[in-house]
Amino acid sequence: MALDAALPAVGRPFALARGLTARVALTIVVLASFAVRLIASAAHPAPRYFPDEYLYTAIARALGSGRAPSVRGESAHFPALLEPILAAPFQALFGPELAYRLTQAENAVLMSLAAVPVYLLAPRLSLSAGYALACAAFAVAIPDLVFASYTLADPVAYPFAMGALAAGVAALERPARRMQLLFLALAGLATFARVQYVVLPAAFVAAAVLVDRRRVLRTQRLPLFLLALPVVGAVALGPARVFGYYANVTHLHVGGALLHWAGVDLFLLAFAAGIVLVPGALVAIARPRGRTETAFAGLSAVFGSGLLLEAALYASNGSSRFQERYLFALLPLVPVGFGLYLKHGRPGRGAVALLSLALFALAAQLPLSGYAAALGKTDSPFLVAVFRLEKIVGTANGSFVLAVLAGAAAAGAVLVSRRGGGRYAVAATLAAALLASFAATVGDSANARQVRRDYLPVNASWVDATGLRDVTLLQTVGSPPASAIEQLYWNRSIAAEALLGDARATDVYAAPRVRIARDGTMTGVGTTVLVQDYAATIRFANAARVATAGTFSLWAADEAPRLELLERGRFSDGWLARSGALTVWPDASGRTRGTVRFTLSLPAGAAPTTIRFGKARYDIRPGEQTTVIYTIDARGPWSLPFSTTHGGNAQPDLRFTSVRSTPPILARAGAPAVRPAATA
């Protein structure tokens, strides 16, 4: 008998040479994973997955303060509440920074505990304790454990999903009330944490039919009855009330792109699993032997198909990228399936060869660099690791290295099927997972630190530090939602959001558009506003500027804030957009009288640009300055549009601008000029 064919049946764990018991070794795996993820979280100083991380935290704050789930005062019909419930005590007892760090620590514990059900699953399939330990280590070595640093539902749902799969196999193997109830509880918790895992009950029902066929109503009467109750309730309530925040899933389009993304997801998931184990694992799942293996195969196949459908449906409806967040719970099943393949004596050599050849051909034809570019890696820690490699060795070299590794892994799968060496394939896969996890963690930490530097001051809770409360975040036209969400995340005193003009909201929750009266009074905001100055210059007639940070300024008034001046299209660094408008509102008399002054210029090396302000045209050349003065005498608001007629200048951050302008200085007739503090 080949050595690796007997490998899963070895009585003592091959990794426990020093006499440690398997349970002690499993404990070490869990603790080591927790320690590593805790250290990695320390290097992840700010959330960056928006708006999800903010929404979970906002709901946790509402729960922690004794309120119903809500975001900025608006009721949140959010079905995935387990993560906010677990984080609520931290939000109730501690400040934003410590609550954030404690949530990360909690996530590190939960994700590391996923090793336990994976370890328990393998021996049930007659795999050795040592092999089970390798499977458990793989479950916490995958790059997706980087999500422990995020305030998302994934870290919470992952261990419950793995536990539900292990309990489901046990309940299908020997239908007993205790194990059936355990499966229902774990599947319910996984779904309560992340709605995508609603496929778990469906997978259990399908696997039960596969295992027991006509006897299923007798053997699985209790779980079938209990699972039918929420289905009846969901039908009665309707999808909008059941799915809440996710109700739009019923309106997603099903078309040809669905099949395309299903294929892409399968290919990239196989790559993320290391390729070498995948063909053998698929053969074992396709050819189960006995009741227990049939239960595992049926549960895994339907569970995987459901997640794949969800991921492909989401990607084919606008989110065109690899949805690894939906799929990574399938990765720990690969080494388990491969163990069955070894136990069976490595059958299906032809099938393994064909699958290996197909994976290699796809890897050669589809460079991963195309999927890891730009936003393609947003939901994929594996592609973050790929991008990190390409950043070090170059895109072309990185693609070549990955194609060579894919070829070697595919060849390894064929070699194992014919000559053995399964333990080396498992060891290589585990090593590859650790290496990819390290690269993903380094890349993620760098991105999170960059977000912290770009969007936040040293004290991220700077608005709270002023002592002001019930602050309204005022989003202006052209302002990026991401920077605004960071302020919402770290400052509990920001209680509302409002939109000025055609500004973009940060999320789907309460963000009414501000109405501006003829005298400039804004309705729909409180007396304290946090203004996003990224693409607008604002001054108020009756409010004082309390503090500034980056592109934000905090203003406080004794009554409703009244606008004095707004220049839409002037960026915080002084560049003007290709078009915009300058508006001045009247004084108490109802008239707008005085002068507005600003200076136009271009730095050396910029392209000469022609810009119009109203009917006047100004030709601006690099190194020159042109001072513009307008005398105003109008009843009600006065507005001056501007637009670029020739030239323009592209910025490194992809903004297409025209010329630079100093902040407009308004000098009202009979009053001293009010000069802005900014000089950009």
Say what each PLM segment does.
Residues R12, L16, L31, F267-A297, ...:
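Hydrophobic, aromatic-rich transmembrane alpha-helices
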Residues P123-S126, A164-Q180, A208:
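Membrane-interface transmembrane helices that cradle and orient dolichyl/undecaprenyl
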Residues A105-L125, G163:
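Transmembrane-helix motifs of polytopic, lipid-linked glycan transferases
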Residues V10, D502-A680:
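C-terminal luminal/periplasmic domains and tails of membrane-associated envelope-modifying transferases
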Residues A22-Y49, V140-A141, A190, A228-P239, ...:
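Transmembrane signal-anchor helices characteristic of membrane glycosylation enzymes that use polyprenol
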Residues V36, Y197, P201, A206-P288, ...:
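Membrane-lumen/periplasm interface segments of specific transmembrane helices
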Residues A42-Y54, S65-A88, R101:
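Membrane-proximal lumenal/periplasmic loop motifs of glycosylation machinery
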Residues A76, S149-A157:
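Short acidic/glycine- and proline-prone juxtamembrane loop motifs at membrane-interface regions
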